């Protein structure tokens, strides 16, 4: 490979994409700088020289955000980037998923792919630049990678598909789709949509694949020009004689164990066979390498038999038909003090989701590279070890938990009511209590139930289902509602969430080459049937969102004030608004357009805070009459409070009909008197009169007396 800088360019969605090689990070096995518009991402690939002594492929993909890319200095005391943001973790997963299947079985060398985002143009996706850069860094390196791959973002505006939409176009789009794959096949899909039909989603995927083919042809030109020769790597293989011996000893018993229907009983039966075989070789004092190979052979026996049963004999591990969904059970309102709760059980998968409603001030603040500054809807997913009957350390959420939480959020967001219709922040937490596959989709179903229980006026209920595929030669079977073993040993994990009208989220990972459009179409239609079945079950438990919120949920009232008066409500250094909050115990959020949201669980305090704010922003008009309290007495008159925050002056000459010698002769501090606004001067000072009202009253009495005499 040449060490001189070389530059390659292509047009991508009307913006130039440039790849630079041979200048940066030259000690990595492969490195490229991808410029897309003003976005710049450095992608590198490195690999260990020797294979690691592990039974899996040790691949790490990191997408690293740097705040200098958008001209920001990190917040906090340390002033440097800390742990990766959720967006960065999701981007890392997005790049990992299409790359991972393209390494040979038995490849055990450690591989690390790192993309550093160095400059961001919001209209030119840094994730897509990083995906292309990661593929290219591997492809031009000597690492045995069977790529390249590429990715594209697809939107739809007014019925027309758009590649890599700009920020403005994304706001108008009803599809947000990321598709990745090789020139021959798609192997990764990640999508959110606004209840879009399955047929349209399929067309969008195919539209994206056409662009992928063009980007791969571009990469192949670069590899031809600067690529290194691939290194010869010894792949991990089991000994042929050992393979035959283990199979003769275990195959028949293992086949019987696999067909035990109940998950734990099946696992116990399989483990019993494994234990017997391992003990046999331990008795022969086999070394660690041999025992490792024995485990590998036993795993392959299980995998091959499960796949054969599904594709040829059409038998699933738990005895279901291909399109059959496990038994469903749901319940709502099981936690009294929470704002809403939903328990969803599907076979041996169970999720308990809790909905919490908060004020708009409870939104999540985002300090990242994107244009979004906050979000008012959150879905968090927890996967404790007891859900699979295991013990392990309890730590914070990992990549998997964050990814599963994100697909739930994406699936539910299109049906969340607008801030105008429902001025609340909504947080969902899904606790996985039992797991045997499809937990992310169970969390979507549980979360829908929880929000309906909480009284969130959803546009439509959402359900999710995980589809699978097992393909052997010409034989294939599409599976509805896959369980853990089918996910692990199958060729596809295809999660589909949506309403009765259409899809709201898709996530697909494919482990094989050449998935045809027909299989995809069949999987989507089979998923729709399953989704509608699950929705009907959920609606039998709670047909519509509750009409009233929980007694423990905050009550929110909305009012509008003149934007020029916002500073009066806040006061110098927040003094006024803090006083209201301290006095009433409410939360107050003020938008720039003058919309004010007041929230607390006490409606009486909400009303009190609203009255105080109304008084602060109220405009005094000449001619208005007030019951005013005397606050201060001076020689020249009395200062009175018309309402909270607004005072006026009753001059001594306006206190009474007769001449007043001393103000104290008429009023004292604390008295309440009726006054009329007679003037507001240029400086905004309010002049009041008591005398005018007394005179008007005197004249009314005189007229009344006159009328009385005439009647006599």
Swiss-Prot record:
Involved in mRNA degradation. Catalyzes the phosphorolysis of single-stranded polyribonucleotides processively in the 3'- to 5'-direction. One of its GO terms (cellular component) is cytosol. This is Polyribonucleotide nucleotidyltransferase. It comes from the Bacteria. It comes from Bacillus cereus (strain ATCC 14579 / DSM 31 / CCUG 7414 / JCM 2152 / NBRC 15305 / NCIMB 9373 / NCTC 2599 / NRRL B-3711). GO terms for biological process: mRNA catabolic process; RNA catabolic process; RNA processing. Its EC number is 2.7.7.8. GO terms for molecular function: 3'-5'-RNA exonuclease activity; magnesium ion binding; polyribonucleotide nucleotidyltransferase activity; RNA binding.
């Amino acid at each position: 490979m040449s060490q001189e800088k070389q530059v390659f360019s292509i047009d991508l969605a009307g913006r130039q994409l440039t790849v630079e090689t041979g200048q940066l990070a030259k000690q990595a096995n492969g490195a490229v700088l991808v410029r897309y518009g003003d976005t710049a991402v450095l992608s590198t690939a490195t690999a260990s020289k020797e294979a690691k002594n592990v039974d899996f492929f040790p691949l790490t993909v990191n997408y690293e955000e740097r705040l200098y890319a958008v001209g920001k200095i990190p917040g906090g005391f340390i002033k440097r980037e800390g742990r990766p943001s959720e967006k960065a973790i999701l981007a890392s997963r997005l790049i990992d998923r299409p790359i991972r299947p393209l390494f040979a079985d038995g490849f055990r060398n450690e591989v690390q792919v790192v993309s550093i985002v160095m400059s961001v143009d919001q209209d030119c996706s840094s994730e897509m630049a990083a995906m292309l850069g990661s593929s290219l860094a591997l492809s031009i390196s000597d690492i045995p990678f069977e790529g390249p791959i590429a990715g594209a973002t697809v939107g739809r505006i007014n019925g027309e598909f758009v590649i890599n939409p700009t920020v403005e176009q994304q706001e108008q789009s009803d599809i947000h789709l990321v598709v990745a794959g090789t020139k021959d096949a798609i192997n990764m899909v990640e999508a959110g949509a606004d209840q879009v039909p399955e047929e349209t989603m399929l067309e969008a995927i195919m539209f994206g694949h056409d662009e992928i083919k063009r980007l791969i042809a571009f990469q192949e030109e670069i590899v031809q020009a600067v690529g290194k020769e691939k290194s010869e790597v010894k792949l991990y293989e089991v000994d042929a004689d050992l393979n035959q011996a283990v199979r003769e000893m275990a195959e028949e018993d293992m086949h019987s164990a696999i067909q035990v229907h109940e998950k734990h009983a099946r696992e116990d039966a399989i483990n019993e066979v494994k234990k017997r075989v391992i003990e046999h070789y331990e008795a022969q004092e086999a070394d660690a390498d041999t025992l490792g190979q024995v485990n590998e052979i036993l795993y392959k026996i299980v995998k091959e038999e499960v796949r054969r049963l599904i594709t040829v004999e059409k038998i699933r591990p738990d005895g279901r038909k291909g399109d059959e969904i496990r038994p469903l059970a749901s319940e709502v309102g099981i936690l009294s003090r929470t704002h809403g709760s939903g328990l969803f059980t599907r076979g041996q998968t169970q999720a308990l989701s809790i909905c919490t409603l908060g004020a708009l001030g409870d939104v999540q603040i985002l300090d990242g590279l994107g244009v979004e500054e906050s979000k008012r809807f959150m879905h968090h997913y927890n996967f404790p070890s007891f859900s699979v009957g295991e013990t392990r350390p309890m730590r914070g959420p990992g990549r998997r938990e964050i990814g599963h939480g994100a697909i739930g959020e994406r699936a539910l967001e299109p049906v969340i009511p607008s801030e105008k219709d429902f001025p609340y922040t909504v947080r969902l937490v899904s606790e996985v209590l039992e797991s045997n596959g499809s937990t992310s989709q169970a969390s979507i179903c549980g979360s829908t139930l929880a929000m309906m229980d909480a009284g969130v006026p959803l546009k439509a209920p959402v359900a999710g289902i995980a589809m699978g595929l097992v393909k052997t030669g010409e034989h294939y079977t599409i599976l509805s509602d896959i369980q853990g073993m089918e996910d692990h040993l199958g060729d596809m994990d295809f999660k589909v969430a949506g309403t009765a009208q259409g899809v709201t989220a898709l996530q697909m990972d494919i482990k094989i080459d050449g998935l045809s459009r027909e299989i995809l179409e069949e999987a989507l239609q089979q998923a729709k049937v399953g989704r509608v079945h699950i929705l009907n079950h959920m609606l039998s438990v709670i047909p519509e969102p509750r009409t009233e919120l929980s007694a423990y949920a905050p009550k929110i009232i909305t009012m509008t004030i003149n934007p020029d008066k916002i500073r009066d409500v806040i006061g110098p250094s927040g003094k006024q608004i803090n006083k209201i909050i301290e006095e009433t115990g409410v939360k107050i959020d003020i938008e720039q357009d003058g919309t004010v949201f007041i929230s607390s669980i006490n409606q009486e305090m909400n009303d009190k805070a609203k009255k105080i704010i109304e008084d602060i922003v109220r405009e005094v008009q000449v001619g208005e009459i007030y019951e005013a309290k005397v606050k201060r007495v001076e020689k020249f008159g009395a200062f009175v409070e018309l309402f909270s925050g607004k005072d006026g002056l009753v001059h001594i000459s306006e206190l009474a009909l007769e001449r007043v010698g001393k103000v104290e002769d008429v009023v004292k501090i604390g008295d309440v008197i009726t006054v009329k606004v007679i003037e507001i001067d240029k400086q905004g000072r309010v002049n009041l009169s008591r005398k005018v009202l007394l005179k008007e009253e005197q004249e009314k009495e005189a007229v009344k007396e006159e009328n009385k005499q005439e009647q006599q």
